[in-house]
Amino acid sequence: MANRPLFKRKKFCRFTAEGIKHIDYKDIDLLKDFVSENGRIIPARITGTRAYYQRQLNLAIERARFLALLPYTDQH
C-alpha cells in the first residue's frame, strides 16, 4: 500500500482567514512561507491560497526579488 497520510488536512486560504486584504512586498517573513527551499513560488493547489491572493503573492514575490529582498534561487 502507498505511503498515504491517514487524513488529509483541509486546505484554507491563510489570507482570507487572517483578514489580510493586501499582500505587501516588504513583508519578507510572510513571503518566505510561500517560497520553496530552492526559491520557487509554491503553487496554490499546494498552499490552498485563493486565486486572487495567489496573483498578489506572485507580484509581491517578484517585486521583492527585483529589490533583492528575496533571492531568485537557493544558496548553491
Curated annotation (Swiss-Prot):
GO terms for molecular function: small ribosomal subunit rRNA binding; structural constituent of ribosome. GO terms for biological process: translation. InterPro entries: Ribosomal_bS18, Ribosomal_bS18_CS, Ribosomal_bS18_sf. It comes from the Bacteria. Keywords: Ribonucleoprotein, Ribosomal protein, RNA-binding, rRNA-binding. SUPFAM superfamilies: Ribosomal protein S18 (SSF46911). PANTHER family: 30S RIBOSOMAL PROTEIN S18, SMALL RIBOSOMAL SUBUNIT PROTEIN BS18M. This is Small ribosomal subunit protein bS18. It comes from Nitrosomonas europaea (strain ATCC 19718 / CIP 103999 / KCTC 2705 / NBRC 14298).
